[in-house]
Structures are given as C-alpha cells and as structure tokens.
Amino acid sequence: MKQGIHPDYSATNARCSCGNTFIFQSTMTKDVNLDVCDKCHPFYTGKQRQASSGGRVDKFNKRFGALGSK
C-alpha cells in the first residue's frame, strides 16, 4: 500500500434523536446525527403497525362494484 494517500480512520460519535449515542469507526471527522437507530426504530422495538390502507383495486371496487351486480 502507498503511504500517505489513505484518509485517517478514527472513532466517530453517532447521536440519535431519541438520545442514544454510540461510537463507530469511520473516515468522517464530525459527529453524526441520526433520525432513528436500533433502540427507537419500530422494526427493532416490535412496535410495528400494519398498514390497512386500501389499494387501487379496493378503491375501484368501492366506486364501481355496485354497477356489476345488476
């Protein structure tokens, strides 16, 4: 490997909006602000909600479903 061409690799702080902080190795020199992390993301916390919004087919059937029953 050539000397002096690679960026510095050091510890960087990451801070989530929920208040959780952790340290990881990166070439970034500034702290990283995150929107979600593994402590507050719904997938990892088990607080997922099922989306029950109807799609285009349901919308079509609501509008025109009664016409086909004549």
Swiss-Prot record:
Q: Which GO terms describe its cellular component?
A: ribonucleoprotein complex; ribosome
Q: Which parts of this chain are annotated as the region Disordered?
A: 48-70
Domain of life assignment: Bacteria
SUPFAM superfamilies given in the database record: L28p-like
Q: Which residues bind Zn(2+)?
A: 16, 18, 37, 40
Q: Which cofactor does it need?
A: Zn(2+)
PROSITE patterns in alphabetical order: RIBOSOMAL_L31
Which key words are in the record? Metal-binding, Ribonucleoprotein, Ribosomal protein, RNA-binding, rRNA-binding, Zinc
Cofactor binding mode and count: Binds 1 zinc ion per subunit.
Entries under Gene3D superfamilies matching the protein: Ribosomal protein L31
In alphabetical order, the GO MF annotations are: metal ion binding; rRNA binding; structural constituent of ribosome
Name a single GO biological process: translation
Its assembly, as annotated, is:
Part of the 50S ribosomal subunit.
Query: What family does the Swiss-Prot or TrEMBL record give for this protein?
Result: Belongs to the bacterial ribosomal protein bL31 family. Type A subfamily.
Q: Which NCBIfam families match?
A: L31 (TIGR00105), PRK00019.1 (NF000612)
Job description of the protein: Binds the 23S rRNA.
Protein name (Swiss-Prot/TrEMBL): Large ribosomal subunit protein bL31
- Which organism does this record belong to? Photobacterium profundum (strain SS9)
